[in-house]
Amino acid sequence: MASVVLIGTQWGDEGKGKVTDFLAEKADLVVRYQGGNNAGHTVVAKGEEFKLHLIPSGILYEDKTCVIGNGVVVDPKVLLEELAYLSERKVKTGKLLISSNAHVIMPYHRLLDALEEDSRGEHKIGTTKRGIGPAYMDKTLRIGIRIMDLIDDEEFAAKLRRNLQEKNNLLTKVYGVEPLDYDAIYQEYSGYAQKIRGLVADSSLVIDESLKAGEKVLFEGAQGTLLDLDHGTYPYVTSSHPIAGGACTGAGVGPTRINRVVGVIKAYTTRVGEGPFPTELADETGELMRQNGHEFGTTTGRARRCGWFDAVIARYAVRVSGISDFALMKLDVLSGFEKIKICVGYRVNNEVIYEFPQSQKIFKACEPVYEVIEGWQEDITGVTRFEDLPKAAQDYVRRIEQLTETQVTLIAVGPGREQTIVRGEIF
């Protein structure tokens, strides 16, 4: 038995898709445990680029089984579109299973998400308007429609009718928009149910049987630590738990079954949407990072905000998820910078703090305290051994290890599978 949880350690967009794809080669089962199609991951395989939002990255291996766990909220329309997209690209995909306990994103979730965000005015939280938050709200309120309900005609009809009555009251009386039509939604989603029925399974049981058989299981998180509902930069967070602990509840597996936690971390820092960002660079340096790193959202296309590496955030991620290894991404993007900065602490109210603050009011007031180290000019995209990196690049990696007390086991020097420096085994 071997199981690894793969998480994002910043605000998402760290490059988890590439690492999942890289590690999936040795895994038997790849499990997505939270989030929905608000998260995008890009994978480059055999020179081809694939952009996915809901289906686990491991689907590109035809001998793997991929699982969408109970902690995921599933938009069946998007799911079927992604399967069609892979088919059109003539990809021989692996087996896909969907948890019967996963909740379904309905049309009213998407509509309410957009209406609520627009009503916030200057207090917007940066939602993708894909219905993720409202779907999780219904789950918490215990009125949500699960995959098992969707494929049961009688259950689906009854639950849809009850939900739509409530949601249409909200839409017409609070937001002043037209009500949604029951028959249209029922017909549309019944069609989806027929197409996904054969994929539905007790995912927790599938995972348990795989682990008992001695197989290797990779749990794939979406978003990142600082978007976690409890441990992120609230309220600028997602509605689920991207941290390692989320794998247990979102996949139905006990914590003693987890062997390692790999934190995917970018060699610099990015953020999409609203919220404080101490190391953000609103200058030519930040723009150069954005262009060199192609920092535009997979899901929204929005330009990502860019800044220097923040070791305070990295240490915090290690603490809340028990990270055993880092996968350091996009080291090649920093080639060409004469000097490179690392944030080692925050200055706030004439005091320097070295731990991530719980208060967003304090975090918003934080100014970065930097260490400045030498950069490197060499192109490192073809380097395959750590020892062959420029000395300055090696020193940069070692300094991150020192500041976080965590080993950097994988280093990405380009988007391809083969552009990965391996310094130790994960599985």
From Swiss-Prot:
SUPFAM superfamilies listed in its UniProt record: P-loop containing nucleoside triphosphate hydrolases (SSF52540)
Keyword Oxidoreductase: no
Single GO biological process annotation from the record: IMP metabolic process
InterPro entries attached to this UniProt entry: Adenylosuccin_syn_GTP-bd, Adenylosuccin_syn_Lys_AS, Adenylosuccinate_synth_dom1, Adenylosuccinate_synth_dom2, Adenylosuccinate_synth_dom3, Adenylosuccinate_synthetase, P-loop_NTPase
Cofactor note: Binds 1 Mg(2+) ion per subunit.
Entry binding sites for GTP: 12-18, 40-42, 304, 330-332, 412-414
EC number in record: 6.3.4.4
Primary residence: cytoplasm
Active-site positions on this chain: 13, 41
Pfam families per record: Adenylsucc_synt
Subcellular location: Cytoplasm
Catalytic activity line of the entry: IMP + L-aspartate + GTP = N(6)-(1,2-dicarboxyethyl)-AMP + GDP + phosphate + 2 H(+)
Binding positions (Mg(2+)): 13, 40
Enzyme category, top tier: ligase
Metabolic or biological pathway, per its Swiss-Prot or TrEMBL entry: Purine metabolism; AMP biosynthesis via de novo pathway; AMP from IMP: step 1/2
Source species, domain of life: Bacteria
MF GO annotations: adenylosuccinate synthase activity; GTP binding; magnesium ion binding
Cited function: Plays an important role in the de novo pathway of purine nucleotide biosynthesis. Catalyzes the first committed step in the biosynthesis of AMP from IMP.
SUBUNIT field: Homodimer.
Protein name: Adenylosuccinate synthetase
Organism the protein comes from: Desulfitobacterium hafniense (strain DSM 10664 / DCB-2)
